[in-house]
Amino acid sequence: MATLGNLLAPDLIQAGSCWQLCADVNGYSRSDGESLTTQACHGRRFRILEKQRKRIAIQLLEDGYRCWLELEAVLGRAERCEVWRPSPLSATEIERRLPGVLAWSEIAQQRPNVYLWGGTTEPDMDCSGLMQMAFASQGIWIPRDAYQQERFCQPVAALPDDHSLLRPGDLLFFGTRRRCTHVGIHLGEGRYRHSSGADHGRNGIGIDSLQWSDTHPVACHLSLIHI
């Protein structure tokens, strides 16, 4: 019987067992093919859901995200652990940690990087991966994808060209009324940091300003401090 601290081996792969990564790994949306959907860094925990020939279906414990991991990537690189979930944080505690979130995102921008769809480990990340890792750096776990982050947060009643209700650390969501497709973090005075692809004029992390008359307007403005 496996005990805590055992490294993951073929005979220990059981549905429901929990493990902690000893290395960064890629997560895929399907049981085969090059379909990167997320990444999980060293130290993250997961529950095994099922096993296929070359991949295992897992659920990351910090955010509940489901994906497939290559067996070769995790065998001998994950330790048995107990079931775990993040502790709830008060709005006051989250607000206290926001300067650290912003500082982490600034450091990430300063490192050479490119936009990577599904990227959630440094240096190359997608928009929501950057947000998740910035908050996780301060012990705050938010959902993985932009549309999930939008649903997770509390709306702020911001008015066009009036940034007075937006605070540094608020998340800004872009897209349509039907679905959010992009996210950035507010720095103050309408400026925000985000990771975007080359088709948006960048290929990595940068700073832009809100333009309410843009043809791709911000769909809504949400704040983590109002959880």
Where are these regions (language model features)?
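SH3/SH3-like beta-barrel superfamily modules
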Residues: Q39-E72
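Active-site nucleophilic cysteine motif
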Residues: T121-Q138, I142-D145
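Beta-loop motif signature
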Residues: Q20-H42
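Active-site nucleophile-His-acid catalytic modules used for acyl/amide transfer and hydrolysis
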Residues: G100-M125, R144
